[in-house]
């Protein structure tokens, strides 16, 4: 799901998502990180 992290590129979301979900799968969507 979406987390409260602003981004411009999907790679900016990899670390935050790994901390939240334990998975590095992430996308930057509408300048916000989405974890899968």
Curated annotation (Swiss-Prot):
Intracellular or extracellular location(s): Secreted
Keyword Disulfide bond: yes
Main localization category: secreted
Gene3D superfamilies xref list: Knottin, scorpion toxin-like (3.30.30.10)
Residues at the site labelled Basic residue of the functional dyad: 27
Domain of life (superkingdom): Eukaryota
Keywords: Calcium-activated potassium channel impairing toxin, Disulfide bond, Ion channel impairing toxin, Neurotoxin, Potassium channel impairing toxin, Secreted, Toxin
InterPro entries linked to this entry: Scorpion_toxin-like_sf (IPR036574), Scorpion_toxinS_K_inh (IPR001947)
Record-annotated disulphide pairs: 7-28, 13-33, 17-35
PROSITE patterns for this protein: SCORP_SHORT_TOXIN
Stated family: Belongs to the short scorpion toxin superfamily. Potassium channel inhibitor family. Alpha-KTx 16 subfamily.
Domain notes: Has the structural arrangement of an alpha-helix connected to a beta-sheet by disulfide bonds (CSalpha/beta).
Protein function: Poorly competes with (125)I-kaliotoxin binding on rat brain synaptosome (IC(50)>100 nM). Is a poor Kv1.3 ligand. May have as real target KCa1.1/KCNMA1 channel. Shows weak toxicity on mice.
Annotated protein name in UniProt: Potassium channel toxin alpha-KTx 16.8
Organism: Buthus paris
